[in-house]
Regions:
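A glycine-rich phosphate-binding loop feature that marks nucleotide/adenosyl-phosphate handling sites
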Residues: 180-188, 319-323, 378-379, 403-410, ...
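Single-stranded RNA-binding regions, centering on S1/OB-family and related RNA-binding modules
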Residues: 552, 564-784
């Protein structure tokens, strides 16, 4: 099997792309590194395609290894034929390989095996030959042997039938046909063990659906209902058609003596041996597909959660709500440092609302708190009421956000949290985590087991190893997509960086604590156990602000520094210009469209294009000296200018792409590929850009809405909290997420909600119905 050619066909990419990617993987390169820094080799395959390629590569290599093991085993038994070898070599799945190996596989003791030990195989072959003319009992009498346990002709015939049944069951072609027919015509049936019992599985109490049509989330629901002993689930196959097919294959001659025997043997082979195995195989395959689908959805939801836009530059009050033990508070400054913690008791049974408000007002004034980050757990509803009342009483603007606190309690009780906050109790750690989730979701959520974050479906029922690996890959891709500040990143964040293990991550933090801030990327090579290969893999994802080299603050890889510097020289850009641009980009809230009032370089005209970018505005300021003319050119081409002296030269800054006439030629001159050149240009044009800025910011609230206030037709704005196969759950600010069924998401037909929405999206919804008793809210995203 040409694995690379097969991968190219499956993924619909060029074989050369597969060849290059497989080589890079085999050389020990990580997926994030290949996706970001080996685009020329792979043809710019993204991390999702690369992950799929890697997964299939591992499967197909394991398949080839298993084929060789099977072939060796059959050859050792001296039973290999050219036809069998070809079938094994051509097999595309493990199931087919195992079906072909079944007749030759060493078996545990079976009825057929026992019959063979009793010497009944010749009788079985005699019956299969279908040429007996006399009484079968007379033929069978010759095999009576009390020492071997064959006490009668009937016992001999029964043993022979067991041997034939196993032969029928072991035939790979028969199994292939039966499996295919069952997939096409079989049904999944379920019934309640107790019809009168109320449960969440009521829709499955008398349920049936074709195997070929049943969707993943129903399979997972049926599996859970069966595991909880609420449902009985089975697969109903077209048994009549299957037995008829087997009879045609096995009964090849008209023989009134052997035909009835073979008919009953075929029925036994199917019902006792084949049907249970095929049902198990198909249900396992359905479950595997359902799990893969659910894991994929979980992964996409997790990615959206991790890539939420950070709320920076704000002092945040984290609020972990509770009843009896009180609400834990933590004030966190703009850098994530915890300034203060306390506990208030505004909820039952204490109900000390006035005291709680007094404490809150004092903290808000003392620490200039801008935002309250409220966890959505127990007592969240009651806490929100207090917050809303408080906001109305304040003399300064304060808003609040309800944050999904899933996993916060897991983190707060972890060894990591204990190391980070040794003097805090569990509740205080949780409050600090809830505040930080708002400031930098990615940095905070990486500290929590992804499975505990709660944006999936049936995650606790799945293959935990597969789920864990898939979610870890999502976190790894997200962290590397954003990059980390080498001087502030925690070990929890660093360990997800390409090429960095948990041990090396801790070593980086220890090196930083002992030697102070990193001033350049090369210093990473001084970290214990971080060698040249790890450095190659990680360096481009590590950022150093205000370091020796401004390129260290970009995603330009050190291996491309020489090319980047040559490019800057050709475009008349200095390192100081880049530094100035980075500083300007880092100033949050500054209007980058503001015209720089300084003068242009003497004797030159300064043309700043695309002044809405921080780069354009900053470099305009950075290059200004006395004399010359400043021309601010907006995206629409209109310009305004201010003379400062005569000039005969012109420096064009802003859209660097437009200044390059022949990119291919320039890339060759710089000794890099065109794609790498494009990436370097983007980094220079938009320094310090965070890809999370493209995501929607969370909804900041200052008032409260009650579920009883909801009326059909009411239009609201909400945040998508979870995406599942049959719809999306939207937080509309009433402490009970509403469900938008997949049929209500958009006017056009979609197979899955992810085609239209993602976790974290801000969406407009309309109330369809409200069920106060069951606490269910039905919403629609359709217009009108």
């Amino acid at each position: 099997m040409d694995i690379n050619a097969l991968l190219a066909e499956e993924l619909k990419i060029k074989k050369s792309q597969v060849d290059a990617t497989v080589t890079l993987i085999d050389e020990g390169n990580t997926i994030p590194f290949i996706a970001r820094y080996r685009k020329e080799a792979t043809g710019a395959l993204n991390d999702e395609v690369l992950r799929n390629l890697h997964e299939r590569l591992v499967y197909l290599r394991n398949l080839e290894e298993r084929k060789q093991q099977v072939i060796a085993s059959i050859e050792e038994q001296e039973k290999m034929t050219d036809e069998l070898r070809k079938k094994i070599e051509d097999a595309m799945t493990m199931v087919v390989v195992e079906d072909l190996y079944r007749p030759y596989k060493p078996k545990r003791k079976t009825r057929a095996g026992v019959a063979k030990e009793k010497g009944l195989e010749p009788l079985a072959q005699l019956i299969l030959a279908q040429e007996i003319t006399g009484a079968l009992e007379e033929e069978a009498a010759a095999y009576i042997d009390e020492e071997k346990g064959v006490e009668s002709a009937e016992a001999a015939i029964a043993g022979a039938k067991d041997i034939i049944a196993e032969m029928v069951s072991d035939d790979a072609d028969y199994r292939s046909f039966i499996r295919k027919l069952t997939w096409e015509e079989g049904k999944i049936l379920s019934q309640a063990k107790e019809e009168s019992a109320e449960s969440v599985y009521e829709m499955y109490y008398n349920f049936e659906e074709p195997v070929c049509k049943i969707v993943g989330h129903r399979i997972l629901a049926l599996n859970r209902g069966e595991a909880e002993k609420v449902l009985t689930v089975k697969l109903e196959a077209p048994a009549g058609k299957i037995i008829s097919y087997l009879e045609k294959q096995v009964i090849t001659k008209k023989n009134e003596i052997t035909t009835p025997v073979l008919q009953s043997t075929v029925e036994d082979a199917y019902s006792r041996l084949i049907a249970p195995a095929i049902e198990r195989d198909i249900r396992n395959e359905l479950t595997e597909k359902a799990e893969d689908g659910a894991i994929s959805v979980f992964g996409k939801n997790l990615e959206q959660l991790l890539m939420q836009q950070p709320i920076t530059g704000k002092v945040v009050l984290g609020w972990d709500p509770a009843f009896r033990t009180g609400c834990k508070l933590a004030v966190v400054d703009a850098t994530g440092k915890v300034l203060a913690t306390t506990v208030i008791y505004p909820t039952a049974p204490q109900n000390k609302v006035a005291e709680a408000k007094a404490t809150l007002k004092k903290m808000i004034k003392q620490y200039n708190i801008d935002l309250i980050s409220l966890g959505n757990g127990t007592a969240s509803r009651e806490s929100e009421q207090v917050i809303v009342e408080l906001i109305k009483e304040l003399d300064r603007p304060v808003q609040y956000v309800i944050v999904n606190e899933a996993g916060a309690s897991v983190y707060s009780a972890s060894k990591l949290a204990t190391e980070e906050f040794p003097n805090f109790d569990v509740g205080q750690r949780s409050a600090a985590s809830i505040a930080r989730r708002l400031q930098d979701p990615l940095a905070e959520l990486v500290k929590i087991d992804p499975k505990a974050i709660g944006v999936g479906q049936y995650q606790h029922d799945m293959n935990q190893k597969k789920l864990g690996e898939a979610l870890s890959n999502v976190v790894e891709d997200s962290v590397n997509h954003v990059g980390v500040d080498l001087n502030t990143a925690s070990a929890s964040l660093l360990e997800y960086i390409s090429g960095i293990s948990k041990v090396i991550a801790k070593n980086i933090v220890e090196y930083r604590e002992e030697n102070g801030k990193f001033t350049n990327r090369k210093q990473l090579l001084k970290v214990a156990k971080l060698g040249p290969k790890a450095y190659e893999q990680c360096a481009g994802f590590m950022r150093i602000t205000d370091g020796d080299n401004p390129l260290d603050a970009t995603s330009v890889h050190p291996e491309s520094y020489e090319a980047a510097e040559k490019l800057m020289e050709k475009l008349s850009i200095t390192m100081e210009d880049v530094k100035a641009a980075q500083k300007e980009a880092a100033k949050k809230g500054k209007d980058a469209k503001a015209a720089p009032k300084e003068k242009a370089p003497k004797g030159k005209k300064l043309v700043v294009k695309n002044t809405n970018t921080a780069f354009g505005a900053a470099l305009a300021a950075a290059l200004n000296e006395s004399g010359g003319e400043v021309i601010l050119q907006a995206d629409n081409g209109k310009a305004s200018s201010g003379k400062a002296g005569a000039g005969n030269g012109e420096i064009r800054i802003g859209s660097l792409e437009k200044r390059i006439k022949d990119k291919k030629k320039l890339a060759e001159e710089l000794g890099i590929g065109e794609i790498t050149l494009t990436d370097i240009i983007k980094e220079l044009e938009k320094p310090a850009r965070d890809p999370r800025e493209d995501m929607q910011a969370p909804i900041l609230r200052s008032d409260i809405l009650d579920m009883k206030d909801l009326k059909p037709g009411m239009e609201l704005k909400g945040t998508v909290r979870n995406v599942i196969d049959f719809g999306v759950f939207v937080d509309i600010g009433v402490h009970q997420d509403g469900l938008v069924h997949i049929s209500q998401i958009t006017e056009r037909f979609i197979k899955h909600p992810l085609e239209a929405v993602s976790v974290g999206d801000i969406v407009d919804v309309r109330v369809i119905s409200v069920d106060m008793a069951k606490k269910r809210i039905a919403l629609t995203m359709k217009k009108g």
